[in-house]
């Protein structure tokens, strides 16, 4: 009996020590993450997971990997979580979100399909699937997914907004405006909805009314960067070059690192004949957003490309 007691007692002691070590590493990692010591947090979480593949700890590790831009390492953790808890759609949605940040739209689409296969009643699964479809240049599929999301959640503001944007990209102004009006019923001060409404009205109806909507947004939020871009562009379209430059100047006072504002101010300066000033702004825009440099031409005629991936 003494031998058996010591044998099983030793096993219990070892298990208890492992549990203690795991807890210390896990919570040291969480504390390190909170105070920004991310390298140490990764070390703690990795060692904790070697003891026990705890889903919460793995989620923390994947998040920290993302924070330090180790995207492949983060993806591997999310995938492992889907393997450990394969019946939980939330892990597949977390993987989908990660794929979106990595611009892996095919992987995002697959993760969403698996989440929907596990539970067809999660609105965000269809919303994320729509974002994947947009990334894959499939607007029709995006609209179908957003419509399903809205059927499950009638006040799903993000889904209405995205569907309106997709419809407007297809120049379906009437349908887009219906979604915008629904958004404004939900929240009459929805800045994104008001700006999109202004953008559509500027093209299809009345530039003066569009300007009123843009100014309304700037009154509510003087830091709304897209509002400055739309206002400046509207003034440029009306040949009000000096006023447009003044709008971009104001935007740059608020955010000196606003690459799109430099680009648009350069376009305005070129229209005014200030080639030197235009070139300076173009160079500054490329300096701030080098990934978009190849999309900026000397004529500034491709603004859409510059803002393609801006999360407005």
For each predicted feature, which ranges?
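Position-specific recognition of the canonical hydrophobic site in helix A of tetratricopeptide repeat
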Residues: 33, 66, 93, 100, ...
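Canonical tetratricopeptide repeat
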Residues: 60, 94, 128, 162, ...
């Amino acid at each position: 009996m003494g031998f058996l007691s010591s044998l099983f007692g030793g096993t219990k002691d070892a298990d208890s020590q492992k549990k203690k070590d795991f807890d210390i590493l896990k919570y040291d990692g969480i504390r390190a993450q909170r105070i920004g010591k991310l390298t140490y947090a990764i070390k703690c979480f990795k060692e904790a997971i070697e003891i026990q593949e705890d889903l919460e700890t793995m989620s923390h590790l994947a998040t920290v990997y993302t924070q330090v831009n180790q995207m492949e390492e983060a993806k591997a953790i999310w995938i492992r979580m889907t393997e450990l808890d394969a019946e939980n759609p939330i892990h597949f949605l977390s993987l989908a979100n990660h794929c979106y940040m990595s611009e892996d739209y095919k992987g995002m689409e697959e993760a969403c399909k698996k989440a929907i296969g596990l539970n067809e009643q999660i609105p965000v699964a269809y919303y994320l699937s729509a974002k994947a479809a947009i990334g894959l240049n499939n607007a029709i599929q995006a609209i179908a997914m957003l419509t399903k999301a809205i059927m499950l959640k009638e006040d799903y503001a993000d889904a209405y907004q995205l569907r309106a944007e997709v419809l407007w990209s297809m120049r379906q102004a009437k349908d887009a405006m219906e979604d915008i009006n629904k958004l404004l019923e939900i929240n009459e001060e929805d800045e994104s909805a008001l700006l999109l409404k202004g953008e559509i009205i500027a093209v299809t109806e009345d530039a003066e009314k569009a300007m009123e909507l843009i100014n309304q947004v700037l009154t509510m939020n003087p830091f709304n960067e897209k509002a400055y871009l739309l206002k400046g562009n509207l003034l440029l379209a009306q040949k009000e070059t000096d006023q447009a430059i003044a709008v971009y100047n104001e935007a740059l006072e608020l955010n000196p690192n606003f690459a799109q504002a430099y680009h648009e101010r350069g376009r305005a300066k070129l229209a005014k004949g200030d080639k030197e000033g235009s070139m300076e702004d173009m160079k500054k825009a490329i300096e701030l957003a080098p990934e978009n440099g190849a999309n900026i031409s000397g004529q500034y005629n491709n603004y859409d490309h510059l803002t393609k991936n801006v999360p407005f």
